[in-house]
């Protein structure tokens, strides 16, 4: 048994309760984060190691969660491939999208030095974090990363040009995915080298295309990135949001832990992925916009589930929304920590 309830659980060790952390826990749901945003832009905070470290640790102090996740963005990989990224206005956008480029493979050039500030941020986080709190590193999944690279921006998670482009020239897309994979492996291994204790791959748009197409074009990349991390002895988490019944292709050969969205109950997922896999998820973040009574009601399922399954990390089906009252997040953390899990 270690100091960290998160690391014990992801290693299959039974603890007195499930660990709790949230995707997007270091973000707009926190008043302390919004105070910093009054002074600094998002990209500025991300690229300043001191600020990135500070933001990463805000939810540890403010919410009492059991793990920190690096404050960064999935779109640093396209930047490291030479694309110019901006966060001005409504979300991320690229100066030139791949759909507007005649030869995407020549357009993409390796600039791994663009990621150096992130490794400095990791060093700073490890200098200042509490001992019992592990740091989770991450990168975007290949499909999700390429969605943004190809379209150039996202409006309401809509990528109208991207999916037809896969069908038009699958061979080209596979070559672009290979470039994303190569840079993602380099990035992931550097994070491990600098001290992250677990690594999550965010495939936020896994449900955008048919499962068989995902399996052919993108899943080999997922295996390569997570496999490289696992070879270093670091536990891996895979979030395939929207994959639905396609989750049956997620097994222990692919990752150590699968992060589940809100579409399927945990007990059904457990039946599909088997007993060895650690589960993470899958409280619907939108419940946190309701009343404490509604939270109590929904929490009951998770309490009953966690009494039977210790290989489970309490998290959300996706990230915290800016509209969620921070009091409700605090309330949920308290419920996880103070409930009787019968272990």
Residue ranges and their predicted role:
Residues 1-89, 215, 224, 324-343:
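N-terminal basic, low-complexity leaders that serve as flexible interaction/assembly modules and, when applicable
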Residues 70-86, 105-110, 196-214, 317:
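Glycine-rich, proline-tolerant flexible connector loops at the mouths of alpha/beta enzymes
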Residues 114-343:
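Active-site loop segments of alpha/beta catalytic cores
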Residues 35-53, 105-114, 145-159:
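An N-terminal domain-start capping segment
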């Amino acid at each position: 048994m270690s100091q960290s309830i998160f690391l014990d659980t992801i290693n299959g060790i039974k603890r007195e309760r499930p660990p709790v952390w949230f995707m997007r826990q270091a973000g707009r749901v926190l008043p302390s984060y919004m105070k910093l945003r009054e002074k600094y832009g998002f990209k500025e905070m991300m690229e300043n190691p001191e600020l990135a470290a500070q933001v990463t640790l805000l939810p540890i102090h403010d919410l009492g969660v059991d793990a920190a996740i690096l404050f960064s963005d999935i779109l640093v990989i396209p930047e490291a491939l030479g694309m110019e990224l901006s966060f001005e206005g409504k979300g991320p956008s690229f100066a030139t999208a791949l759909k507007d480029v005649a030869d995407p493979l020549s357009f993409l050039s390796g600039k791994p030095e663009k990621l150096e500030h992130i490794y400095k941020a990791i060093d700073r986080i490890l200098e200042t974090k509490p001992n019992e709190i592990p740091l989770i590193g991450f990168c975007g999944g290949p499909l999700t990363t390429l969605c943004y690279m190809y379209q150039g921006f996202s409006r309401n998670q809509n990528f109208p040009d991207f999916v037809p482009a896969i069908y038009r020239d699958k061979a080209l897309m596979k070559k672009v995915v290979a470039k994303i994979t190569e840079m993602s492996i380099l990035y992931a291994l550097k994070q491990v080298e600098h001290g992250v204790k677990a690594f999550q791959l965010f495939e936020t748009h896994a449900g955008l295309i048919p499962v068989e197409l995902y399996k052919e074009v993108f899943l080999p990349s997922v295996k390569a990135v997570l496999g490289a991390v696992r070879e270093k002895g670091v536990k891996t988490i895979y979030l395939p949001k929207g994959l639905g019944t396609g989750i049956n292709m997620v097994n222990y050969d692919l990752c150590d832990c699968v992060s589940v969205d809100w579409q399927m109950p945990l007990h059904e997922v457990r039946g599909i992925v088997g007993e060895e896999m650690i589960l993470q998820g899958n409280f619907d973040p939108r419940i946190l916009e309701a009343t404490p009574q509604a939270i109590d009601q929904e929490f009951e399922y998770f309490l009953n589930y966690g009494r039977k399954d210790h290989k489970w990390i309490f998290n959300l089906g996706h990230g915290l929304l800016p509209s969620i009252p921070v009091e409700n997040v605090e309330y949920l953390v308290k419920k996880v920590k103070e409930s009787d899990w019968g272990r």
